């Protein structure tokens, strides 16, 4: 890190090119190449493959800049023109993408570390877990009325990405090089592949395009911090990490800001506004009325169109009342239900029955999306009927059982944050029978004959850790497992939503 600091401690007059010199450093590409060995890029690299030549990388950058100023197209369909000094330029261009992502991450790491210095913060590891969101939702959402279910727009123009990055990175040479890469990228129209409720990236250069997408989302989310700080004087710790930029509202002329700006801030002044995002989906909950949520919806659509110059469909934002509708988020169906209670008040001669109703946040396991994921991974059909997995038939019996058991344990652990997990019994049934059919297919036998020969060995692989504890402690108490499925259990290592298709 001392080598990195040398470029960031220059005089302010020399800071306009502080990133560009790092692109020509060999250890940057060693870190980028070894990114799979270490989760953090700031660990010391263990080495790199000798088949890469960093000298060729530096020469290639110079060659690209020359081509850019000569207005020649670098990427063509002719394989002979994709050679530079006898090397495949696509391979080294991918390395430059990865190296650029590493370089851009460095100033943010230094800025974040300096931001944490002198601040007393509880560094709790479990705050990184997705299960830490549900206690927050249970505490906050039970007092709210409406929620906006938002799908963040993804088809953003490449030049807007560069302009967004310009507010964070003060290096014109690096931005020109980035602009050239993006416009000459062969599949630039499919950098971010749209999905129904999420987003995905092409397998090549995932780190680089994920970084650009995070810039885009950060710029989009900064509007909430801006309005929050303008509408109230409450101190927000998270807002301190955002950097000042050109005020976006000056670019919106006609519909959104036709009234006085203070009046608009008064409309959006809501001390009970909460925002949560995961990947390409976010929720905005409020204690206000449906009129306020419709104004938020109208405002966000115009904000995307006027500031990001992208057309956004209003159907990407749904308004739902928490007491009547369920919210599909992170694989859970969450809602706020009225829990009735009756209190009997006894006086000297008379008694009264008082009915009360309290709001309770509830989360259920969404069985339909899970069956759809199992069907996509070829564990079952669309109706949930188990099928064999032919591609795993060449594995050993223990590997097959371990894979199926691991998939179920991951799904069970992820959905353990729900109070009602009885639908997981159906997922266990699908995976167990799919495992049995795969093994029977391998041994050219029937499922009944194979299960009779295997016995309870297959069953034990599909016990979660909690079930094993209760099963060993109370082997004859079958009701104990049922009580377990009515408890909320949180884990500190749930960093991503469980998807059976990722276990291929």
UniProtKB/Swiss-Prot annotation:
Pfam families: Intron_maturas2, MatK_N
One example of a Gene Ontology biological process annotation: RNA splicing
Cross-referenced PANTHER family: MATURASE K
Localization in the cell: Plastid, Chloroplast
Family: Belongs to the intron maturase 2 family. MatK subfamily.
Alphabetized InterPro entries for the sequence: Domain_X, Maturase_MatK, Maturase_MatK_N
Predominant place of localization: plastid
Gene that encodes the chain: matK
Descriptive protein name: Maturase K
Keywords (A to Z) from UniProt: Chloroplast, mRNA processing, Plastid, RNA-binding, tRNA processing
GO terms of molecular function: RNA binding
Role summary: Usually encoded in the trnK tRNA gene intron. Probably assists in splicing its own and other chloroplast group II introns.
Organism taxonomic ancestry: Eukaryota, Viridiplantae, Streptophyta, Embryophyta, Tracheophyta
Assigned GO CC terms: chloroplast
Domain of life, per lineage: Eukaryota
Cross-referenced HAMAP family: MatK (MF_01390)
